[in-house]
Amino acid sequence: MAAMSAATEIANASRSGESAPISCLSTLIGSLVDVLRTNLSRKADRVRIFEVGRVFKRDPSVLDSDQTVGGFDQPVRVSALAYGPADAQQWGVSSRSVDFFDVKGDVEALLAPRTVAFVPAEHPAFHPGRCARVQVGGRDVGVMGELHPKWRQAYDLPQAPVLFELDAAVLTERVVPSFTSVPRMQSVFRDLALVVKDSTS
């Protein structure tokens, strides 16, 4: 799935036991789909997985330092995937597949209590018309959607998983609640009953 994200190849680097070079990807989505396929090959029918890690994007404005590599931005991302039945098997509940709105609810819960907006978008990993940019406070913080049919076919998946990827930094941004002092006077409640003529409107 590296083809859908501008992968950056590391010179003279390979995985243990593999001759192929390591690529620094700009998204975690591909690795989640790889894990899904492994689980399906072991007969798992309901899969929920997540990953936290750095992605790599070319950015000429980034300079060399003790924590950065010149020309590359390395933000931390949180990505997750849901596949299969929406709910665990139980009596009296009909089975249905997880969908866009189930994962949308997960994203809203993850970012609560902030208000989250979902804006229709296009992304090479996701199904056209079933993809959205995730916004908090008017700024893009991630993307979510159903896996593109092209990738579903390439990975030979019986059905499409739903995924999201968020900027990890937004998860640590918390609005500090404001407090007010307790009122000196207690509130008072009174029940009133009024008797009026029927002709009164």
Regions found by a protein language model. Give the residues of each.
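Extended beta-strand-rich architecture
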Residues: 1, 11-201
